[in-house]
């Protein structure tokens, strides 16, 4: 949230992603206190504790980060489940040669996971959460979205190439 270093926006637990609009976000602080909750009428959408733990960890550790995006797309979840992870098989995927990985530790409900998560992310703009999904960060929503769009595109391209059932041509890391 611009001008509020201790606050960020997150989606409410239970609301479908396709239902989200700008007015649906909850504003919470790094301690997990809800600072603003829209009136959802009879629908009492709750607080997303796993989302809070994940997002607040990054915001606290990386003050330059203005936005954290975390997705569970089919392509992202598929690549996150492969031992090989994301391969440098095309120009877009080569942007992620230094991508971070975080091993699955179950549903993120323990604040203790924050330390491991932040250590695994390091200074990277993108991380694959093994057996879970994708995460990108940026100084702005646009920057984080741009990283996510490229990461998602790379995951889709890799799955399409792997479906051809022929050896993949990886690009040399020296390039």
Model regions and ranges:
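Glycine-rich flexible loops
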Residues: 1-175
């Amino acid at each position: 949230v611009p001008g509020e270093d201790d606050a960020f926006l997150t989606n409410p637990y239970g609301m479908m992603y396709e239902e989200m609009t700008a007015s649906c976000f909850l504003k919470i602080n790094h301690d997990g206190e809800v600072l603003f909750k829209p009136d959802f009428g009879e629908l009492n959408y709750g607080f997303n504790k796993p989302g809070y733990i994940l997002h607040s960890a990054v915001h606290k550790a990386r003050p330059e980060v203005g936005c954290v995006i975390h997705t569970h797309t089919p392509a992202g979840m598929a690549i996150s489940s492969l031992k090989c992870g994301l391969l440098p098989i095309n120009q877009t995927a080569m942007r992620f040669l230094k991508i971070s990985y975080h091993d699955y530790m179950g549903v993120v409900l323990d604040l203790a996971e924050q330390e491991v998560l932040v250590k695994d992310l390091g200074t990277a703009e993108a991380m694959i959460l093994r057996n879970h999904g994708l995460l990108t960060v940026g100084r702005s929503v646009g920057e984080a979205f741009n990283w996510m769009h490229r990461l998602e595109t790379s995951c889709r391209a890799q799955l399409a190439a792997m479906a051809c059932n022929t050896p993949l041509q990886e690009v040399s890391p020296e390039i």
